[in-house]
C-alpha cells in the first residue's frame, strides 16, 4: 500500500511537471473566511467599468488567457518592471484591462489587506465579464498566489494568429490542454475585436501572387477587404464574431464552419479532423438536447485553463499592488 501511494504521488508530480496543471489546493470559496466580500467586490467593480466600455468582457477574458499561458495563472502579465516586463512581449500585443484589476485590488486591499491575490482577481474578473456578455455563470476555484517573475522572454511560445493548427495543438498540449479545449477556448472569440494588423497576411499575402486565404467564404471576402483595405490603417478594429460580437454564444463556431471566421487560427479549426469534429458536435440539431452543451463544456475548459501552473501554499506572494512585486 505504501508503495502504491508513493507511485501515485510520483504520477501526480509528473503531471504537474510535464503539463503545468497544478493539483494543489485551489478551492471554490477560498476567501469565504478571510475576505468573504472578495468576489462581490470584483463583480461590482467589473460591472461598473463595463457600463462605460462594452468591450470590457472580451478584454478581461483575453487578459486571463494571456496570464495563464505564460508562467501559469500567476498575475505575471500585470507587473511593470521596465523594458523586460512580460506585458511588453509581442505575443501580448493589445492586451488590456490592467487598470480594472488595479481598481479591484485597491478596494480589496482596503477591505482585506494582503489577502486576495492579483491572479485570483484576473480569474474572477474574467468570470464576471463572461456573465456580463450573457455567457454562463460558473464557480471559480481560488487560492492562487502571485508569481515573482515577469519577463517578456518567457512569452515567446504564446499562440499566434499565423500558427498552423498543428502548432496550436502542440502549444495547448504543452499547457495540459487538449484539442477540445483548444476549440472551446478559441470560441471565446465570440466576443471582442481584432486589428487589421492581424488580417493583412490572410487577406493579401496568404498564397503566392498576393492571393487571400481560400477558406474565406467568397461572400465574406469583400466585407473583410473593405474593413481592412490593403495598405490601410492597421489599427482599425473589426468584430471577430461577425454576427454577435458582444454576445457570448456559439455563433463563432457556426461562422468557422461556414467560412466566416475572421482569424486564420479560428478558420484552421475546421481544417483539422479532430478539431472539426469538436466544432460540429456543438452545431447539430440534437445539441443541446443530447450531449453536453457548448456553454457547459466551455466552463470546464476555462476552469481547467485557470489551473495551469498555479502557485499555492507558500509559493509566490500576495502582492499589495498588482503592477509591482512586494
Curated annotation (Swiss-Prot):
Residues annotated as binding Ca(2+) 1: 67, 70, 72, 74, 76
Location of the protein in the cell: Secreted
Site for Transition state stabilizer, residues: 62
InterPro entries per UniProt: Haem_peroxidase, Haem_peroxidase_sf, Peroxidase_pln, Peroxidases_heam-ligand_BS, Secretory_peroxidase
Binding residue positions for heme b: 189
Cofactor info, note text: Binds 1 heme b (iron(II)-protoporphyrin IX) group per subunit.
Biological-process GO terms, alphabetical: hydrogen peroxide catabolic process; response to oxidative stress
Binding residue positions for substrate: 159
Any single Pfam family the record assigns to this protein: peroxidase
Glycosylated residues (UniProt): 151
Annotated GO CC locations: extracellular region
Cofactor(s) in the UniProt record: heme b; Ca(2+)
Paired cysteines (S-S): 35-112, 68-73, 118-322, 196-228
Superkingdom per UniProt: Eukaryota
UniProt keywords, alphabetically: Calcium, Disulfide bond, Glycoprotein, Heme, Hydrogen peroxide, Iron, Metal-binding, Oxidoreductase, Peroxidase, Secreted, Signal
Catalytic residues, chain numbering: 66 (proton acceptor)
Class of the enzyme per the UniProt entry, highest EC level: oxidoreductase
Family: Belongs to the peroxidase family. Classical plant (class III) peroxidase subfamily.
Protein name: Peroxidase 43
The organism of origin for this protein: Arabidopsis thaliana
Organism ancestry: Eukaryota, Viridiplantae, Streptophyta, Embryophyta, Tracheophyta
Amino acid at each position: 500500500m505504501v508503495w502504491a501511494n508513493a507511485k501515485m504521488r510520483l504520477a501526480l508530480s509528473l503531471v504537474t511537471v510535464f503539463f503545468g496543471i497544478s493539483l494543489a489546493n485551489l478551492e471554490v470559496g477560498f476567501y469565504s473566511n478571510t475576505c468573504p466580500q472578495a468576489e462581490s467586490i470584483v463583480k461590482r467593480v467589473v460591472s461598473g467599468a463595463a457600463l462605460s466600455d462594452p468591450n470590457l468582457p472580451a478584454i478581461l477574458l483575453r487578459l486571463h488567457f494571456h496570464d495563464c499561458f505564460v508562467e501559469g495563472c500567476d498575475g505575471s502579465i500585470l507587473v511593470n518592471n521596465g523594458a523586460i516586463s512580460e506585458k511588453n512581449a509581442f505575443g501580448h500585443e493589445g492586451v488590456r484591462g490592467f487598470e480594472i484589476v488595479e481598481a479591484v485590488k485597491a478596494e480589496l486591499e482596503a477591505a482585506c489587506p494582503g489577502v486576495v491575490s492579483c491572479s485570483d482577481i484576473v480569474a474572477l474578473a474574467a468570470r464576471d465579464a463572461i456573465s456580463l456578455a450573457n455567457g454562463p455563470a460558473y464557480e471559480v476555484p481560488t487560492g492562487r498566489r502571485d508569481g515573482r517573475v515577469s519577463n517578456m522572454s518567457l512569452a515567446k511560445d504564446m499562440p499566434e494568429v499565423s500558427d498552423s493548427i498543428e502548432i496550436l495543438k502542440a502549444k495547448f498540449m504543452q499547457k495540459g490542454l487538449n484539442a477540445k479545449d483548444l476549440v472551446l477556448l478559441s470560441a471565446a472569440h465570440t466576443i471582442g475585436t481584432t486589428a487589421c494588423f492581424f488580417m493583412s497576411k490572410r487577406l493579401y499575402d496568404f498564397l503566392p501572387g498576393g492571393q487571400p486565404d481560400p477558406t474565406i467564404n467568397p461572400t465574406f471576402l469583400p466585407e473583410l477587404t473593405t474593413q481592412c483595405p490593403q495598405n490601410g490603417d492597421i489599427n482599425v478594429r473589426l468584430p471577430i464574431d461577425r454576427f454577435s460580437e458582444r454576445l457570448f454564444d456559439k455563433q463563432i463556431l457556426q461562422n468557422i464552419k461556414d467560412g466566416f471566421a475572421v482569424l486564420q487560427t479560428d478558420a484552421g479549426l475546421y481544417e483539422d479532423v479532430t478539431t472539426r469534429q469538436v466544432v460540429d458536435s456543438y452545431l447539430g440539431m440534437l445539441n443541446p438536447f443530447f450531449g453536453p452543451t457548448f456553454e457547459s463544456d466551455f466552463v470546464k475548459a476555462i476552469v481547467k485553463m485557470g489551473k495551469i501552473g498555479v502557485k499555492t501554499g507558500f509559493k509566490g506572494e500576495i502582492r499589495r499592488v498588482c503592477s509591482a512585486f512586494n
